[in-house]
């Protein structure tokens, strides 16, 4: 038995035990309830950061808790190991991405083990291995056969620095989410998966996600963006051509005064042949940022095409303008413009002197559009001679009437549209899974035959930083299909492909098929998924989409991939900088900072670095390389031990909120573990105890035991239902304060202490497993702690023998009394009136009323 708390020795010993016993390796067991706990797997960037530690500690706490509930718990881990950072590092270090990636995996794997996470390492996967991406390629060919994959030339977001296509979600404020380079527009052939075919189901099934955060569900609903409207056909004057427009406000159609089309619309390009101003405008729009944020902020500009459109209901001719706020790849690439009832159209019409005609007004007043558009759904008026019966109708009645009219004339139809676009999965980089499609000599594009899968990505390459090695190597692209020469696709998959199905591969990671359906359907869906909310509209949507694809191909039988989702907050740390001689900011690591002055609230006022630079303190911000304010988990574990780091991570804040890194609080967590260790070993040193006899306990012993069992109930509820791990820990700390002060003279004192400490180490086991493992054995228990059950509250101990009653006179506290739990009102009154404080404040007064709230409060009204 080790009497001193030495975390490095304790943790190494316990981790070796877990490894030798393969404690966390599991197989399917139909006789046990399963629990699949999964944290989003890491990109092997080189070192774990504190964000990883927080995510994986939360997952490990949940998994270990469920194990003590007697469940068959799967907690796997792997590596999201394709992606641009590996290419960039390879170019910088004059190596290939593969060795850099595998070295990082080895290092980070040791870090995860150092932190004591209970993973089933036998299921480890790395998405950059052919054993993994082979089945992704196979699945893609099946989707192609089902008509869910297609290739088309499309205007895409292009990062000129990384030379790759970005999804809309990967463009942040007009810049690449990875390297912050300004994004351009480029026409390029792309492979797409028809996620829009599943848009309705993806939206509808959000209602099944009862245990997902409302914020994530709202973000996905908005991203999918279902709308009901009418698609109507406009003619082109002096032409046989027509074009379609979709609107969710058909009630405003009688107020159309111009039509706006995308710069890339065929009509605009045709008109540009004889219009240099329009031609220049089209070129300008090609390189514009088309993200939502940029579109909302940019100046709305346009050029008249010289063409006119024919209104589908009135026959009126309205001008067609090319406008920078209309996108060719969104909707039909054309919008009807009603400046009286749309603010953007109003501003555009005012700028270019276009007509503004009001056709909707408030139900209780006249229309005023002198300053701005009226955008509410009022009642129709001014509908004109062609459709006068619209006047006086509200939105829905007008919608129905216009729909009926257009449908009967073959000029329009009611339609449901989605904001969601099909998923472009092509990337023009090397370090990704090759797309398994080939082009035959006659130009036909077909899937790679199954017997030629996987299409292996060569790993022994030279990165020149200019072109993908598989694009540069013309021999690699050559292949044979049925004796015919063919050429492989040299694009690779978006890495969101790999992360969309990894959770399912863990169920049968070594199967010679994509999934073993029996094993997949035993484990799936995931019971608890953990990751950042920043993934709400990318990974978490693709994750749900892929699960439905897997279901429809017969590999899984559930509709959704995860029952419960927890989105953990970021980890923040102090950030400091100084300006160098060139005026550039130099960020200084917190470990290199000396704080010289704080204010009365402890806020930093003055700090210097080790070289004497006076620093600017910018407050707490997300740990990042750019601000040099990351804290190395390895350093903290070496200094305090893994259990201390884990305890701090779980105690410092509720899991969904940001966590502020404070080393003083880490030291506090360390002191608590040392105190627990000392209390336990002081107890053990007193020798064996007699069995606990609850019938012989005195009042104080009963009160202590009641607190113990109330704590067991609260901690279980906090971890499982509320997921408020910080309050669970606080409850155990409060109990430990009482245990430290509890008497240990009698056999029953020590027997009660044995019961309490045996419960405490199990309550803390999910959070500080190394310490709990050791203390459990030191307390004389023969079984290892992983093989026992979560402590069960003794319901009889929770029954209170007495109640504490607050006694007030005229609403002010005058006494506290303890009465038997079954005391009547009369008994409570008698005892309350006998209290000195009550006598003092009622003497000489008339008692007007006595209010008794059973078991809680006695209020005496006297004057």
Swiss-Prot record:
The keyword Kinase does not apply. GO terms for molecular function: aminoacyl-tRNA deacylase activity; ATP binding; leucine-tRNA ligase activity. It catalyses: tRNA(Leu) + L-leucine + ATP = L-leucyl-tRNA(Leu) + AMP + diphosphate. A motif ('HIGH' region) lies at residues 42-52. CDD domains: Anticodon_Ia_Leu_BEm, LeuRS_core. The keyword NAD does not apply. Belongs to the class-I aminoacyl-tRNA synthetase family. This is Leucine--tRNA ligase.
């Amino acid at each position: 038995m080790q009497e001193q708390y030495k975390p490095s020795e304790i943790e190494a010993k316990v981790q070796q035990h877990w490894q030798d016993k393969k404690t966390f390796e599991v197989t399917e067991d139909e006789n046990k309830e399963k629990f699949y706990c999964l944290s989003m797997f890491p990109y092997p960037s080189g070192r774990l950061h504190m964000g990883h530690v927080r995510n994986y500690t939360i997952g490990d706490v949940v998994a270990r808790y469920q194990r003590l509930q007697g469940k068959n718990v799967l907690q796997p881990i792997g590596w999201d190991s394709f992606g641009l950072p590996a290419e960039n590092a390879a170019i910088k270090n004059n190596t290939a991405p593969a060795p850099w990636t595998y070295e990082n995996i080895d290092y980070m794997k040791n870090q995860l083990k150092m932190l004591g996470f209970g993973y089933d390492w036998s299921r480890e996967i790395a998405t950059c291995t052919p054993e993994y991406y082979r089945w992704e390629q196979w699945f893609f060919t099946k989707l192609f056969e089902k008509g869910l994959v297609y290739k088309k030339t499309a205007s895409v977001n292009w990062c000129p620095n990384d030379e790759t296509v970005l999804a809309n979600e990967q463009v942040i404020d007009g810049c690449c989410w990875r390297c912050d380079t300004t994004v351009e527009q480029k026409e390029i052939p792309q492979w797409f998966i028809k996620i829009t075919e599943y848009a309705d189901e993806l939206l509808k099934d959000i209602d099944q996600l009862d245990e997902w955060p409302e914020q994530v569900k709202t973000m996905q609903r908005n991203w999918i963006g279902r709308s009901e409207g009418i698609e109507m056909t406009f003619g082109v004057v002096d032409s046989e051509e027509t074009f379609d427009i979709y609107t969710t406000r058909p009630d405003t159609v009688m107020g159309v005064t111009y039509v706006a089309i995308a710069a890339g619309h065929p009509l605009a390009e045709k008109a540009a042949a004889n219009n240099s101003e329009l031609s220049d405008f089209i070129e300008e729009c090609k390189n514009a940022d088309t993200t939502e944020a940029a579109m909302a902020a940019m100046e709305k500009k346009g050029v008249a095409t010289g063409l006119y459109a024919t209104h589908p209901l009135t026959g009126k001719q309205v001008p067609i303008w090319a406008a920078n706020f209309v996108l060719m790849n969104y909707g039909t690439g054309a919008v009807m413009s009603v400046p009286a009832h749309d603010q953007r159209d109003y501003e555009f019409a005012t700028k270019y002197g276009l007509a503004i005609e009001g056709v909707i007004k408030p139900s209780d007043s006249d229309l005023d559009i002198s300053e701005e558009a009226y955008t509410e759904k009022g009642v129709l008026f001014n509908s004109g001679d062609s459709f006068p019966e619209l006047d006086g109708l509200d939105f829905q009645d007008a919608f129905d009437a216009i729909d009926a009219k257009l449908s009967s004339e073959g000029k329009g139809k009611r339609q449901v549209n989605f904001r969601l676009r099909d998923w472009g999965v092509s990337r023009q980089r090397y370090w990704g899974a090759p797309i398994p499609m080939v082009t035959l000599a006659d130009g036909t594009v077909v899937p790679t035959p199954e017997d030629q899968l996987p299409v292996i990505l060569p790993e022994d390459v030279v990165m020149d930083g200019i072109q993908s090695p598989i694009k540069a190597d013309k021999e690699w692209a050559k292949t044979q299909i049925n004796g015919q020469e063919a050429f492989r696709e040299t694009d690779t998959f978006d890495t969101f492909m790999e992360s969309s199905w990894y959770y399912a591969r863990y169920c049968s990671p070594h199967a010679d098929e994509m999934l073993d359906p029996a094993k997949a359907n035993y484990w799936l869906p995931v019971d608890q998924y953990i990751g950042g909310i920043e993934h709400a509209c990318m990974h978490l949507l693709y994750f749900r989409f892929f699960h439905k694809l897997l279901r429809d191909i017969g590999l899984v039988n559930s509709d959704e991939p995860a029952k419960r989702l927890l989105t953990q907050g970021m980890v923040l740390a102090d950030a400091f900088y100084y300006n160098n001689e060139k005026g550039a900011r130099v960020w200084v690591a917190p470990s290199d900072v000396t704080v010289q002055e704080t204010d009365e609230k402890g806020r930093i006022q003055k700090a210097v670095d080790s070289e004497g630079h006076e620093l600017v303190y910018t407050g707490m911000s997300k740990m990042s390389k750019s601000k040099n304010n990351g804290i190395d988990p390895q350093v903290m574990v070496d200094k305090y031990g893994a259990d201390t780091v884990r305890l701090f991570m779980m105690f410092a804040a509720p899991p969904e909120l940001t966590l502020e890194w404070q080393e003083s609080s880490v030291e506090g967590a360390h002191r608590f573990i040392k105190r627990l260790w000392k209390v336990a070993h002081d107890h053990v040193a007193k020798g064996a105890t007699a069995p606990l006899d609850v019938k012989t306990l005195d009042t104080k012993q009963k009160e202590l035991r009641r607190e113990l069992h109330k704590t067991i109930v609260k901690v279980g509820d906090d971890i499982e239902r509320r997921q408020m791990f910080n309050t669970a820990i606080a409850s155990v700390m409060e109990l430990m304060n009482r245990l430290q002060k509890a008497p240990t003279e009698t056999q029953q004192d020590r027997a009660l202490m044995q019961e309490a400490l045996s419960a405490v180490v199990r309550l803390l086991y999910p959070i500080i497993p190394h310490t709990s493992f050791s203390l459990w054995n030191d307390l004389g228990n023969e079984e290892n702690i992983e093989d026992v059950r979560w402590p069960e509250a003794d319901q009889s101990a929770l029954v209170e023998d007495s109640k504490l009653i607050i006694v007030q006179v005229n609403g002010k506290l005058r006494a506290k009394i303890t009465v038997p739990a079954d005391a009547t009102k009369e008994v409570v009154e008698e005892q309350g009136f006998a209290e000195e404080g009550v006598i003092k404040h009622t003497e000489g007064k008339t008692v007007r009323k006595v209010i008794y709230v059973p078991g809680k409060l006695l209020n005496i009204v006297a004057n």
